[in-house]
Amino acid sequence: MIEVGDYKVKEGLYYTKDHEWVQVLDDGTVLVGISDYAQKELGDLAYVELPEVGTEVNKGDVLCELESVKAVSEVYAPVSGEIVEVNEELEDSPEVLNEDPYEHWIAKIKPSNLDEELKELMDAEAYAKYLESL
C-alpha cells in the first residue's frame, strides 16, 4: 500500500484520473471500484445505483451513481466491455465502500479492448504521483 497524505493507494491495480480502479482477474475479466481518495471525497455513502448485468459499456460511459451525504457522483467505466456481474452487497450496505474501497468492487466487466485500454490507465505509483498534484 502506498500512502499519499491521508489516502491509500493499493498496489497491483490500475487507476483512472476519475479515481476508479481496475483489477485484472486470472480469467481475463476485470473488477472495477473506487479509490480511497474517491470514497473520502464523497463522504458517507448512502446509496449505490448499480448497473444492469449484460449492459455493454464503452470506456468513459457512466457505470453507476453513488449517493453520499455530500453529493451524487458518477463512476465511469475505465474499460469497455460487458458487465457480467455486480456487487449486490452494495444495495444493502453501500458503506462498505467507505470502510474498505479496495476490497469491495462495484462491477465485473468482460473487457473487449483490454490491452489497449490498460495502456491509458495509471499504475499505483503513477496514480500516487497524480494524487500528490491535486
Locations of the language-model features?
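Mid-chain, well-packed structural core segment of small domains
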Residues: L66-Y102
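Short, well-structured beta-strand-loop connectors
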Residues: E52-L66, E82-V84
